[in-house]
Structures are given as structure tokens and as C-alpha cells.
Regions:
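Membrane-proximal helix-turn-helix segments that form the acceptor-binding/catalytic region
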Residues: 9-30
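A charged, aromatic-enriched C-terminal amphipathic alpha-helix characteristic of glycosyltransferases
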Residues: 219-266
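Short hydrophobic beta-strand element within catalytic cores of glycosyltransferases
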Residues: 181-184
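Short beta-strand->alpha-helix junction loop in the catalytic core
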Residues: 36-37, 52-66, 116-117
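Conserved donor-binding/catalytic core segment of Leloir-type glycosyltransferases
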Residues: 70-89, 95-98, 102, 111
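Aromatic "clamp/platform" in nucleotide-sugar-dependent glycosyltransferases that forms part
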Residues: 163-165
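Glycosyltransferase donor-sugar binding loop
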Residues: 109-126, 140-142
């Protein structure tokens, strides 16, 4: 993965040795979180059987029990960025879009939500974000506890993602479970996560397409809202099925292991 922090920041040598060690352990079964991860592991010549569980472990009911949700049309006209502010998450794309979108829709609020202080592996992005905040274009929420973040999501309309380095994300399940629209690039595993829903996936890296879809998703809830979190809510069940020999449909062996890539999972 050319954009993964393990590769970019010089950790690939020791990580590759660790993976080689795991690859030699007998009776290991690999549970990958998506079809693209399966492909990377197959290319790396993993010997163990590989299964695609198609999602991260997620408890929808537990997340929803933490906060009170507002009806969509009573929520703030707010777009949330919930990923790290590191360069592989493409914060510049988000900030450029904010500047352009606000010219036409000055009433829209854009927010960065972070569990600690706003930081990045490139300080320029932190300085630029703080500059936009001073200009009144962006709000930075720092040092959030999980429930604080959930309360913001439950009063927002769109969670936006523009990451180069992302495979599947708990942030999308959280936002979807809390009644927030989600808008992600049609990149890597996200077509699988979104079951190829073109209304919530934009052309990477087209600001025009992202903004056109953002306008629509700010105006009304997606008819598919809740389906992503329903699907990831079953990830643990899929894992248990595989471990007990009942999940062979998720095994990715042989020359046709890429066939299911285009098939919607739900």
C-alpha cells in the first residue's frame, strides 16, 4: 500500500518480517476486512486460508444507546470530518472543498472532530485548518470523548471522507447508525462498504462530483441510511460462522477469488 503509514514512515521492514512470521504459523485462518485486503494478502503470498468478513466488528445498538438522535431535518446543516488529520487522509482536499463550497452555501458548517488535540504528520495541515477556523470557514472540535463525538454526529447531516489510506472504517458505521448521511470516495474498499451506492460515493478525486453529492445529502436523508451499520452489526456473526466451519462462502481461494469484488454484500 503506497499510502499506508507503515510504508510511508519507514516501518515496512520490521512489519514485513512480522507478517512473514505470522505466515509460517500452522493452522492459522486469516480474517480480512474487505476484498481489497484479501487481494493484497494474496499478492503477498500468504499461505493460510483467507476469508473476507466484509466489515469491522461493530455494535449498532450500543452506539445508538449512547446519545439521543434528532430528526434529520432538525439537525444542523453540518459536515463532519472524523478521520485523523494526517496527510494520507487528504486534509487539503477537504479544506479546498470547504473554501469552494462555502462560496455557494455560506450557511453550511464544516467541522473537524478529534479525540485529542488537532495534530498531523504534516504541521502545515494543522496551521491551515486553524487559519480557516479564524476565517470562520471551519470549526475544530478537539479532545472529544466518544460520547461527545456521537452527540455531534447525531446533530449533523453528513460525515465526509477523502482518505487515500483507508480500507474500511468504523466512522462510517457510527455515522450511519446515528442517522447521519455518509459521503466517501469510490476508492479501495468503499464501493464494497456502500454496496456500490453511487449516490453516496463520489469520483476520486473530483471536487465537483463530491460537492454535487454533498448538496443532495445535506438536503435529505439517504433512502439507504442504516444499511451499512446493519451490515457491519453482523460482522462478529460472520466471524463466528467462519470459525465454526459455517462460513465457506467467505473463503477467497483459487483463481476466481476476485469474482465477488463487484457483488453487493447486502
Amino acid at each position: 500500500d503506497p499510502d499506508d503509514f507503515v510504508h510511508v514512515w519507514g516501518m515496512s521492514k520490521w512489519m514485513s518480517l512480522y507478517e512473514q512470521m505470522c505466515n509460517e504459523i500452522p493452522n492459522v485462518v486469516i480474517l480480512a476486512s474487505n476484498e481489497e485486503m484479501v487481494a493484497h494478502m494474496r499478492i503477498a503470498n500468504w499461505k493460510a486460508p483467507i476469508y473476507n468478513i466484509s466489515g469491522l466488528s461493530f455494535g449498532k445498538e450500543e452506539v445508538q444507546s449512547r446519545v439521543e438522535q434528532k430528526p434529520f431535518m432538525e439537525r444542523k446543516n453540518r459536515v463532519v470530518f472524523g478521520a485523523r488529520w494526517d496527510q494520507e487522509k487528504q486534509p487539503q482536499f477537504f479544506m479546498d472543498m470547504i473554501t469552494k463550497f462555502k462560496e455557494k452555501h455560506p450557511e453550511t458548517e464544516f467541522a473537524i472532530c478529534q479525540g485529542g488535540p488537532l495534530r498531523s504528520n504534516n504541521d502545515y495541515y494543522v496551521k491551515e485548518a486553524k487559519y480557516l477556523e479564524k476565517q470562520g470557514l471551519l470549526t475544530i472540535h478537539e479532545n472529544l470523548k466518544k460520547n461527545d463525538y456521537y452527540n455531534i454526529l447525531a446533530d449533523s447531516r453528513v460525515l465526509f471522507n477523502c482518505a487515500l489510506q483507508d480500507w474500511t472504517s468504523n466512522t462510517v458505521s457510527e455515522a450511519d447508525a446515528l442517522g447521519c448521511n455518509v459521503l466517501f470516495p469510490a476508492y479501495r474498499s468503499f464501493p464494497e462498504v456502500f454496496a456500490n451506492d453511487h449516490t453516496r460515493l463520489y469520483v476520486p478525486w473530483s471536487q465537483d462530483d463530491a460537492m454535487a453529492k454533498l448538496e443532495l445529502l445535506l438536503s435529505k436523508p439517504s433512502p439507504s441510511m442504516g444499511q451499512i451499520s446493519d451490515w457491519t452489526n453482523g460482522t462478529i456473526d460472520r466471524m463466528l460462522d467462519i470459525m465454526t466451519g459455517k462460513g465457506e462462502q467467505w473463503r477467497r481461494d483459487g483463481s476466481h477469488y476476485r469474482t465477488p469484488v463487484s457483488e453487493p454484500k447486502y
